[in-house]
């Protein structure tokens, strides 16, 4: 299956499919004429006498240097090779595929001036599985993601490195094995390929998709913890949340209420329970997870716009002029990444407090210490809770905003930058930590519910426990725990736990 992209209107759902499934993509042929028109205009400018930035001049601080017509192709090649300054481990294939798809969307708007053969090469590389090797570090998020995108482009011109069928090869070899030929870049094409926010945006989108799946699963594990602790569902009453009015809170409250419907555990303590109120980590789940959901939705709107944007420079306007601007500055992406980081941090923080509640016999309303029937002889989930605390603390440190930092670069020509790329990249580690925290809560919540037998939980939550137990058997005696934690985190990350819940209960990213 090939996804047909309509530049300017590619929805989040399609972007997530590209990220998760690695499907090949193509630009809708209806956009080809506009692409070729802009390319023809760039060719006209390159053949003329007037200096135009990036077409017949140097770059950055060197923009005042005029380039001879005979050197234009060399200029573009030199630009790519000199900008391949990335360091660190290679970005994963699914991230690079998304970067390439986003670059297609941007170029496909017909304002960048690249020839159609550049577009078709990217499409063919995605179809045949030639994935450029892009180091993870080196971008400050303005002027675009220069170093990462230069590594992408290097493979296109037969330089650099690329992955093909599991092998890490030179760019030329990877293209050759796939039956493809490198492109010779024409005027402005190198600049159009590297000057954009696609790396930052792809990383931020990946973080967004992972965070959304995590918050949906956190609502499930939060409901499990509520039932395990014999908490009240009264704070999830719809009118409470309607009176405040925040959409995320309303949706989170509804999800929690629905997940707990029919629980025999809940019915067992409707009367005679001397506790007046539950701790905040139980009672305030709609307010906290709902606020996180709202901020993820806000970030989603920003990133959907950015994913469809033209972010290189200069741009070919509708009147045929090539005009320099600053769309390459990734400040919107940096802000969105910071928002996502805050949400990820808070989802994990309140989940960790519920884990701590369930393993503490002074708070768990009758559950044994550390959820083991033989405390002392067995330690149960004691250190799993400690691990969740370590991960929570790590995420708090990483949640510091990246966008508030800036440093002058390129001899002060590029004197304010967004730091969007590493602000977005850290989301991968933060969401991995979050998945592990929520996975631990799944273990504590499920075990807590099982320890309430013969009382049973709701039908929806019973499905979640069954999905968990298919991979992680109930903890009866102490055993090697690392495999349990890994399996539980994977069930969060791959959507298994959220996938068993009936449609319409868990909140969507687009509200």
Curated annotation (Swiss-Prot):
The keyword Lyase appears for this protein: yes
Subcellular location per the Swiss-Prot or TrEMBL entry: Cytoplasm
Superkingdom of this protein's organism: Bacteria
SUPFAM superfamilies documented for this protein: L-aspartase-like
Listed Gene3D superfamilies: Fumarase/aspartase (Central domain), Fumarase/aspartase (N-terminal domain)
Principal localisation: cytoplasm
InterPro entries referenced in this protein's UniProt entry, alphabetically: Aromatic_Lyase (IPR001106), Fumarase/histidase_N (IPR024083), HutH (IPR005921), L-Aspartase-like (IPR008948), Phe/His_NH3-lyase_AS (IPR022313)
2,3-didehydroalanine (Ser) modifications at: 143
Molecular functions (GO terms): histidine ammonia-lyase activity
PANTHER family attached to this UniProt entry: HISTIDINE AMMONIA-LYASE
Recorded family membership: Belongs to the PAL/histidase family.
Descriptive protein name: Histidine ammonia-lyase
Name of the gene: hutH
């Amino acid at each position: 299956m090939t996804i047909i992209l309509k530049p300017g209107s590619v929805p989040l759902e399609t972007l997530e499919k590209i990220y998760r499934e690695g499907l090949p993509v193509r630009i809708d042929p209806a956009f080809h004429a506009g692409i070729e028109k802009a390319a023809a205009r760039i060719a006209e400018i390159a053949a003329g006498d007037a200096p135009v930035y990036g077409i017949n001049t140097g770059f950055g601080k060197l923009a005042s240097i005029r380039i001879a017509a005979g050197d234009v192709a060399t200029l573009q090649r030199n630009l790519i090779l000199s900008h391949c300054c990335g360091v660190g481990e290679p970005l994963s294939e699914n991230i690079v595929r998304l970067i390439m798809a986003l670059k297609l969307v941007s170029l496909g708007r017909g304002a960048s001036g690249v020839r159609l053969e550049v577009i078709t090469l990217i499409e063919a590389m995605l179809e045949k599985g030639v994935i450029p090797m892009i180091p993870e570090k080196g971008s400050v998020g303005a002027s675009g993601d220069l170093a990462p995108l230069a590594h992408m482009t290097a493979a296109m011109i037969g330089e650099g490195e690329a992955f093909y069928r599991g092998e890490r090869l030179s760019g030329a070899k990877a293209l050759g094995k796939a039956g493809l030929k490198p492109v010779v870049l024409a005027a402005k094409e190198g600049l159009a390929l590297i000057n954009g926010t696609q790396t930052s945006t792809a990383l931020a989108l990946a973080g967004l998709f992972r965070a959304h799946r995590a918050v949906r699963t956190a609502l499930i594990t939060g409901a499990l913890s509520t039932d395990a602790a014999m908490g009240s569902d009264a704070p999830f009453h719809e009118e409470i949340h309607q009176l405040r009015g925040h959409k995320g809170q309303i949706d989170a409250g509804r999800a929690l209420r629905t997940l707990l419907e029919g629980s025999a555990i809940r019915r067992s303590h409707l009367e005679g329970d001397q506790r007046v109120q539950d701790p905040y980590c139980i009672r305030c789940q709609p307010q906290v997870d709902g606020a996180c959901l709202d901020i993820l939705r806000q970030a989603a709107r920003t990133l959907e716009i950015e994913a469809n944007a033209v972010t290189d420079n200069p741009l070919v306007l509708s009147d045929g002029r090539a005009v320099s601007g600053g769309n390459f500055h990734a400040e919107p992406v940096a802000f969105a990444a910071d928002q996502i980081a805050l949400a990820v941090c808070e989802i994990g923080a309140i989940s960790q407090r519920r884990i701590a509640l369930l393993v503490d016999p002074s708070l768990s309303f009758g559950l044994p210490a550390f959820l083991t029937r033989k405390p002392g002889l067995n330690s149960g989930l004691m250190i799993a809770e400690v691990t969740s605390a370590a991960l929570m603390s790590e995420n708090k440190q990483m949640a510091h905003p990246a966008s508030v930092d800036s440093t002058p670069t390129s001899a002060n020509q590029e004197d304010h930058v967004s730091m969007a790329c590493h602000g977005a990249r850290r989301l991968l580690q933060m969401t991995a930590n979050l998945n592990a925290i929520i996975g631990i809560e799944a273990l504590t919540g499920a075990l807590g519910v099982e320890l309430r037998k013969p009382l049973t939980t709701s039908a929806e939550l019973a499905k979640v426990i069954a999905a968990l137990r298919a991979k992680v058997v109930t903890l009866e005696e102490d055993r090697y725990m690392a495999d349990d934690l890994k399996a539980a985190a994977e069930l969060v990350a791959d959507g298994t736990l959220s996938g068993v819940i009936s449609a319409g209960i868990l909140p969507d990213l687009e509200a």
